[in-house]
Amino acid sequence: MERTFAIIKPDAVERRLAGTVIDRIEANGFTIVGMKKIKLSKEQAGGFYCVHRERPFFGELCDFMSRSPVIVLCLEKENAIADWRKLMGATNPANAEPGTIRRDFALSLSENSAHGSDAPETAAFEIAYFFNALELV
């Protein structure tokens, strides 16, 4: 079994779409092994997105991710990373396939409703950033 990390972003939580996204996650065979609702500070968002620190959108990204609560999840299944990325859809919702989370719920490229790890190493870092071992079942 493989684990991946997911975030239901502020734009989706604000519009009360978290339950719908969680339903889709479970309907697609994922086991939720960790989940919590949190309010990130700008500093916490910056630490999480540290790989983007030099990118021009970094400040805006940290502002967005800290403006209201998010749902962080650790998901498990065979091929979890690839399958979650497929279910999310392309980063740009205009390019996402119909039926994906971003195509169905995103407001824009920056407010795209969901985040997912892109590799096993990234998943390990992201899961550990938000969960300790006792919080994962």
UniProtKB/Swiss-Prot annotation:
Subcellular location: Cytoplasm
Superkingdom, taxonomy of origin: Bacteria
Record Pfam families: NDK (PF00334)
Subunit and interaction comment: Homotetramer.
One Gene Ontology MF term: ATP binding
Active site feature: 115 (pros-phosphohistidine intermediate)
Cofactor: Mg(2+)
Protein name (record): Nucleoside diphosphate kinase
Keywords: ATP-binding, Cytoplasm, Kinase, Magnesium, Metal-binding, Nucleotide metabolism, Nucleotide-binding, Phosphoprotein, Transferase
InterPro entries (UniProt xref): NDK-like_dom, NDK-like_dom_sf, Nucleoside_diP_kinase, Nucleoside_diP_kinase_AS
Its EC number(s): 2.7.4.6
GO biological process: CTP biosynthetic process; GTP biosynthetic process; UTP biosynthetic process
